[in-house]
Amino acid sequence: MAKVNVRDFIEEQYGLFINGEFQASESGDTLTVTNPANGEDLAKVAKASKSDVDKAVQAAQDAFDSWSKTSKEERADYLLEISRRIHEKVEHFATIESLQNGKPYRETSTIDVPLTANQFKYFASVLTTDEGSVNEIDENTMSLVVNEPVGVVGAVVAWNFPILLASWKLAPALAAGNTIVIQPSSSTPLSLIELAKIFQEVLPKGVVNVLTGKGSESGDAIFNHEGVNKLSFTGSTDVGYGVAKAGAERIVPTTLELGGKSANIIFDDANLDQVVEGAQLGILFNQGEVCSAGSRLLVQSSIYDKVMPKLKEAFENIKVGDPFDEDVKMSAQTGPEQLEKIESYVKIAEEDSNANILTGGHRLTDNGRDKGYFFEPTIIEIKDNSHQLAQEEIFGPVVVVEKFEDEAEAIKIANDSEYGLAGGIFTTNINRALNVAKAMRTGRIWINTYNQFPAGAPFGGYKKSGIGREIYKDAIKNYQQVKNIFIDTSNQTKGLY
């Protein structure tokens, strides 16, 4: 491991951030956060209980009255200041993200943290065009349409992009005038609790409350709390069912960004250099721990024998290791459970004659990697999209490859999934690209690239991949209610009674 002095970036212990103050949990219980690249302990964080959730929700409720009445200009200024401070501390937050998550510093410093800062900046600008409307129905009747904040938002985010996913909830929720109780994953909470230090300096007390704890305990308590008016969750589809149920039982609006098994389609006229890079972006970025990962690679049969040797060579040349090594392109999986899950799917391929492991398929333990959770970039060829490996989300650097003959077959295979989060198309034919994109039942399609997430491009899924869209101007509507004020100016009765 490249030498990083952990205590220059991370404290030994963190409390919960409630009502503008850091404090121990009521029980005094803590959780230990470890570095997945070397197994070393990083810090202890408070483990929130239901009573801590009660305190956080109460703080958010108390702050809502004044925060919701701040002007759009004031809220925009707050968001811009948060953005500025994150930009000033890119190295700080990127280092923490790499330490707790295992992803390469080259990604956290150029993607995760800058995009986080930009979310707050973007939604500050969205506020300038977030306007109501007036409709003069006739000479004596006027309809006013007013956008109002929902109230207290309860949010839980996954471990694969801890600080970035948090910004996808925080920025639009705050812009809309809501207060929020948010919890990161128990395995990767440090960047968000460090971000709370900026909230402490910038925002009024209680506007943002950050809890750390188990999703199955304090996370569930947030989603089932009577004082929470809006739910927002990013994570697995399995957990998403429970969040959706919690919202349905209380009739609370719910935004869900869930799993995927996205198809990355390669046509025979594609630029092969773009194809090789695009396939790697699709499945090796963030160690494949991406909900939108291009985990099904569909290659037109006429170029299959030309593409696969190039792809195999590219995967085998990926340097896997220390996240702070500048030459490393892929680092550690986030934890032992994820590594075991990946290994279990590779074992399925090993035991199935209908699957062929073209390259990879093993945990890496040499050259000092034995204490971390490293896995080889892996390519598995399959013959049928009904195969378990083509239908279930692996969430690692494992791509399954299938052949197709023409556009119609590519579309059929791509849509043969219970998920519909994303997909990719590589072709130089714009008509083909648009026709196939329109036919794919997914919320995001990349053409001649993959896994790009700039603010201003809506992201979210069809089918079991979720409800709602994020990182786009309309995402502010996820955190608003529409009020209609209907006015009769005639000063006369209607004569009906």
UniProtKB/Swiss-Prot annotation:
InterPro entries: Ald_DH/histidinol_DH (IPR016161), Ald_DH_C (IPR016163), Ald_DH_CS_CYS (IPR016160), Ald_DH_CS_GLU (IPR029510), Ald_DH_N (IPR016162), Aldehyde_DH_dom (IPR015590). One of its GO terms (molecular function) is aldehyde dehydrogenase (NAD+) activity. It catalyses: an aldehyde + NAD(+) + H2O = a carboxylate + NADH + 2 H(+). NAD(+) binds at G213, K214, G215, S216, E217, S218, G219. It is an enzyme of class 1 (oxidoreductase). Keywords: NAD, Oxidoreductase. The active site is at E257, C291. Pfam families: Aldedh (PF00171). Transmembrane segments: none annotated. Its EC number is 1.2.1.3. PANTHER family: ALDEHYDE DEHYDROGENASE-RELATED (PTHR11699). Belongs to the aldehyde dehydrogenase family. This is Putative aldehyde dehydrogenase AldA. It comes from Staphylococcus haemolyticus (strain JCSC1435).
